[in-house]
Amino acid sequence: MLFALGLGEAVAAVTHECDYPPEARERPHVTRSVIPEGLDAAEIDRAVGERTSRGEALYELDDSTLSGLDVDLIVTQAVCEVCAVSYDDVRVIAEELPSQPSVISLDPSTLGEVLADLPRLAAAAGVPEAGERLAAQAAERLERIERAVAGAPRPRVVALEWLDPIYIGGHWVPQMIELAGGEDPLGRPGERSRTASWEEVEAARPDVVVSMPCGLDAEQAAAETDRHRDRLERLGARVHPVDAAAYFSRPGPRLVDGVELLADLLHPELVPEPVR
């Protein structure tokens, strides 16, 4: 979001997950995951469950690196402690830093709240006009998609945020499906993602299944989808693995790209193919 607001040069450090735009990867990392790399979905779920049941953190903050950066503002989130360092951990460390930075936590549950966070963050960073402009551009793109698919048949779309165990996409994802011209029979707009069974997914009679394992890129999502290909094929639906990390998991301006991607999957005859 900071880069989209034109503040890239002011970004002193990022998390280990920050990979867009490419220059974000060049900044020092101040977090790391304690979950080993290379695990499949079931192994990740098991590792997360074991650590959280023991009250152990899933991420670590590099407070020594933070201390040397002399930052004025720390941007964090409290939407999901499985996805990033907890807000409480960030706040505690911020209070101990010599620069005494302000901390802003972005915690949206809906697409509207994501867009509202753009001017909120921009104001905190001293560029309010950039935030208003970016939010207006995002809203205009969403309205354009909504107009393009208005009146078209709405396929039943199930978004799988995880495949082992199954999680149904929540928060802003059901709204993204609706804006793109689909009907989400299982997602609950503005609510957290939730577990489900294959039987529940089958009973929803989806026309389309979008496989968007949280935090995984397109290649990883395709590999995870292939692991469950037999079960997915039994649904009789079109199955599309997507780049969740880029377009669905992270509450930022690229969610608009995600809506455009969904609209192209659901109604390719009505919307231009999105540019990636």
PLM features per residue range, with description:
Residues 1-276:
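N-terminal ligand-binding lobe of clamshell/alpha-beta domains
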